Design a protein with these regions (language model features):
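Viral structural modules
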Residues: 1-283
């Protein structure tokens, strides 16, 4: 049976030629490792952390529970504030994710550095929270939907906006009009000849705890999630580029698994030792 995942070129020798291709050429790139942390009355900021807000309500409707929530019903997008009846907070397992990653804009550098661009990126981290009593039991709240219901898993989110400056190529600030039949609509307008941005992100919750906040004469408590964020940012332009090529890729005929022989296919797979004993480079 052919392995469709290992396509090999039958040609032992290839003739290398120069070919012109349309490519996404990277002009500037960087990586950042950010520790995002809410700062409450008991936290001393330090250079290793970036301040973010406490958890906000991500439900479509407000939530209420006069026994624990501060200030009446908590409306969507408001900070989830509660009193000292809540003794702990926890994330619902497997609910944390980057819900939205958006390049807000790419603009010429505000300090006038030629070829550099300011990139504004907004992250939205979504997750579900449990509020816990002194015994570790979940405290319910009422979701004020058209059919009100008690819930213990509360949808919440945190946002973070990053601003970085990257080289994006020196170009005149003309408007570039492009017609491409690959897309619909065909016509696009790039005002100012701005480079394109590509952003990749990986985030994980590091800790979740109760933060103490003094609002006026009132002390209230919030769910504070510390987040570790890895980001790679690239600025690129679509260009014509001359590259060395060995010709077109070979595409062999697919050899599908025949009905009735799943065991033959399974038995041909290598044993996944690394899944049982993950390798390590530590000595």
């Amino acid at each position: 049976m052919q392995d469709n995942f290992q396509v090999k070129n039958a040609e032992a020798q290839q003739v290398i030629t120069d070919e012109c291709v349309i490519a996404q050429k990277i002009y500037g790139k960087c990586r950042q490792q950010d520790c995002l942390k809410p700062v409450d009355a008991n936290t001393i900021p330090n250079p290793a952390m970036i301040q973010i807000d406490s958890s906000r309500l991500g439900e479509t409707y407000s939530i209420s529970n006069d026994a624990i929530l501060v200030g009446g019903p908590i409306t969507p997008n408001s900070i989830i504030a509660f009193n000292s009846t809540v003794s702990g907070v926890q994330l619902v397992p497997n609910t944390f994710k980057i819900q939205d990653l958006k390049v807000v804009n790419v603009q010429p550098n505000s300090f006038g550095q030629n070829g550099f661009y300011d990139v504004t990126i907004k992250y939205t981290f979504a997750y579900e929270l449990n509020l816990l009593d002194i015994n570790g039991a979940t405290l319910p709240v009422t979701l004020n939907s058209p059919t009100p219901a008690q819930i213990t898993n509360i949808s919440a989110y945190t946002t973070y906006t990053k601003l970085i400056s990257l080289f994006g190529g020196e170009a005149a600030d003309s408007t570039v009009v492009t017609a491409n039949t690959l897309y619909d609509p065909q016509l696009t307008f790039n005002e100012g000849n701005i480079p394109y941005a590509l952003v990749n992100g990986i985030a994980n919750p590091l800790t979740v705890r109760i933060g103490t906040y003094v609002v006026g004469a009132t002390t209230e408590y919030h769910a504070d999630v510390t987040i570790g964020l890895f980001t790679i940012i690239k600025l690129y332009r679509i260009v014509s580029m001359l590259v060395a090529s060995g010709g077109n890729c070979e595409v062999p005929t697919c050899d599908p698994i025949q009905p009735g022989d799943p065991c033959d296919y399974f038995n041909s797979l290598p044993f996944p030792f690394d899944e049982f004993d993950p390798p390590t480079t530590l000595i």
